[in-house]
Amino acid sequence: MNQMRNGDLGSESFGTCLLLSLPEDVIAVIARFVSPRDICNLSLCCKSLCDVVDSERIWLVQCEVVKVLPLSEIIQWRIGISSYKALCWFLGEVMKPLVGVWVHQNPELGNVVYVMPGFLSVVGCRIIPQEVGPLGIEEARVMWSPVFEIICGFDGSAKFFLHGRDGKVQCCLHPGFVRGIEKSCNVLLLEVETRREKKLCNEIDETVLLVETGVQLPFRKLPFSYRRNLLHIVTSTVGIPVPDLSSEKLFPTSKDDEAVLLERRTMLLKMHKFGGDWNHMNLEDECTNIPNQVDINKSWKHLGFEGDIRNMDAENQTQRKSFSRYFRSGIKHILGRSSSSKNMSSSRSETRPLNLQKFLNFGDSIGLSLKASNIKLSSYQGWPNMDETRYALYKLPIKDPIANDEYAGLWGGTFGWPPGKCTEDKPGKAFFLLMLSYEESQDGTERLLIGTKILEGTHYGMHPNGSAMFVIKIDSPSFEGFPFDTNGEDFEHSYAGEGTAKGYGFRYPGYKPGTLFVTSKGLLMFIWKATKAVLTLQRLNLGELLRKGVCVSPLPPCLNFAYLIKCHTNVFAPERRRS
């Protein structure tokens, strides 16, 4: 071995040379079992391996391994990106963690955002609560509205856009930044972040990056009113009008869409780089100003404060407020109206502007940001308990069907039998989306199949968002026969359980006995024993439904991301909108 090392192989290790001697196809096969990080680390081991690490064939294989796009689309996407390596980063670090179903508690009819691949992008689409006609769900043109897009840049970087409309019913795009995406993220946050730009230092005549001492106050620590107002200030400033979305394509629906989608992507990349001046620029041009951001002083004044935030002395402000607080406390004591609770409340309220100043002082401007984090969440029957004061979406833990959990996943359906049958007085039926998941009973003696409602297409919420439409004892077969004409269906299984019913008000529904029937074609029917009401469900491919669906205009930007107002009506339906 030593002779081999000192001979023909020179200073190169035998293992390295052996790897280099392998055909590229063999190396690509090996790459399927190696992580992208490990492939990049190969170049640190030996300079001779740099060509292997930069091989397009290896990174094409890595793009396949991510398993978020079919091979045909991966090859199609390559035309707009510098390399498969850059594409692999976008697929693995941006797309894969985000793809899935995201929800919010409000409104009660359902707030479902499905994040799916677009064209060189990730698109968040809100499914509108609606009815479906006699053709059924698969043939229906499902209404949806865009929530956000993340465009893949030429180098694989992520460019964030929030969709929304202004007061004139003009659709706008609001450029922002992707602040961070954790691979196991379960919360998607819309925030404002401070940005510090390079400035010229006259004393030493060179460009320096200003550095702030201390620790920045997180955006989430600001009072809700400041968070809401900052988001409104930024979105109202950086919004860029776009054409009517009904004629726009956000993802391919046919093979002929590639040219149109490439043109739109170029437009979005210019918007992100140049802001409102994008129409007069080329992507190769240099950016001479700071687009898509709001000056800190303007934000400070918009929030009702005077003066230049950079020249304010926080310590003097605190002293003056402490003196005024001491003076007011003395007067209250003299008048006999002193209250410790009021003093504490006053103290907290007076520190809020200082917290805001501390947050804003970390930058020269502010802009939108999207952050995907993993935080500890409690849940009930698979539905996360949410903080309803944060502009956030929560990822549902929808499981793929496996052995013994064959009914897990996303299901859609309507009430009535046979499926799709409508009457003259009711030409459409409310469209329901349910998440089916498995849990153990509280005493641990039974396995339960739970159908959690995440969308309800009625005009007014009849079932609490995130509540169980039915709970099935999956190990307890039912021997009751199907009470209606079978409509040509063969029934394979039936299980006993309970379905939601009127209880103690809207928030606390009761449950009545029922049976879940399973057909050989994969349909599920839950029938309430007393009323004979039938909820018929089928598995859905949301991506395909949305591709052939109808795009409608979004809500104003902040509400479009997360609707924080308690509501039982369909605020997302186009006919209910107000300008």
UniProtKB/Swiss-Prot annotation:
Superkingdom to which the source organism belongs: Eukaryota
Record-annotated F-box domain positions: 16-62
A Pfam family hit: F-box
Transmembrane segments: none
Annotated PROSITE patterns: FBOX
Gene3D superfamilies xrefs: 1.20.1280.50
Name of the molecule in the record: F-box protein At5g39450
Organism for this UniProt entry: Arabidopsis thaliana (Mouse-ear cress)
